[in-house]
């Protein structure tokens, strides 16, 4: 199947063919330009974990990127954000498996992105992306090629599950699901052990797969007789939903781990009873790592802010606004201390002057009045200085937060590989793999050298 999908000369495919080979899998929708940055993070995590497991287990371990080519939610994949702008294309028809749609649908969005590019570096990346899509027939082919432009095709396998041969392998499970409502019954028997609130669970269907119609449209098959007929005679027309897809992955791959995001962790925790019912080993679920790439200005602003990473992320608009109030309050507090000291000094001076010559009290009073006038001048200068400094600090904070949380959304969910490549270069993905600790789910912050 993989050779037919264009990886005939891949060393990773040859490794996967070895009898003792294992896999670590991740998957994602076919987002424009790979979609949000966390797609790259998931793949990098998968590669890093595969290397570590191979070293520890002394058997071949192959990282696999599972293309969500059968997904039908076009509105989630038809756009990307860059530089505060949204670039999108129209996907018609909207209810078809997106992986089989023509790559040319993405041309207008990528052409607009290229026209909006700032500087030769962005321009080169946008033009390269556009060329990849122009050289591909379908969106699935384009995303596979784009993945391989960042990750080594000799190490990584990219698998399109919308394949008749793979569906034939999965046929026994599809038949059993149609006959027994396997996923639904397993969930009903095990949901009391679900580690999340039940309202976060995906509600299982009586049959947890979509059916492709004669013209390729995707729909739920609620008629179990129809579902069973398709499972027995045309399994290639069935597409596992989110609850059955992990079973599909484990059925056709020697999977020991799955790398996913927080949302995926929820539905994976619905499935242990289904794996048990089928006699399948349950892969380890590893939550993906996170990463943020800062520009030179962003990195400098963060360093000047003096905030650690968690405190920076916790800054709310109200807290940022309070910077000026805090600075002015500090000035007031500092002056109060000095004023107390001055008051004490003047009292001593008045007592000593009175003892020496009562007329000297007049001189002390005049001196005190002059000091009061100077105090007001000093206090006004200090407040102005505090406002200016707090304004600069707030500007620095806003600058770095605009990169870390663009539009209030974590960078890895808003921006794309285009941003990371502009900041860190063409090899940012391999460098990310090398930087990750495969045994943890950490958040890395990359600053320019």
Residue ranges of predicted features:
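A glycine-rich helix N-cap at a beta->alpha junction
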Residues: 81-109
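N-terminal catalytic cores of NTP/NDP-binding nucleotidyl/phosphoryl-transfer enzymes
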Residues: 12, 19-54, 260
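A translation/RNA-centric and nucleic-acid-associated enzymatic feature enriched
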Residues: 197-256, 260-273, 282-284, 288-297, ...
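Glycine-rich phosphate/pyrophosphate-binding loops
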Residues: 36-37, 50-75, 283
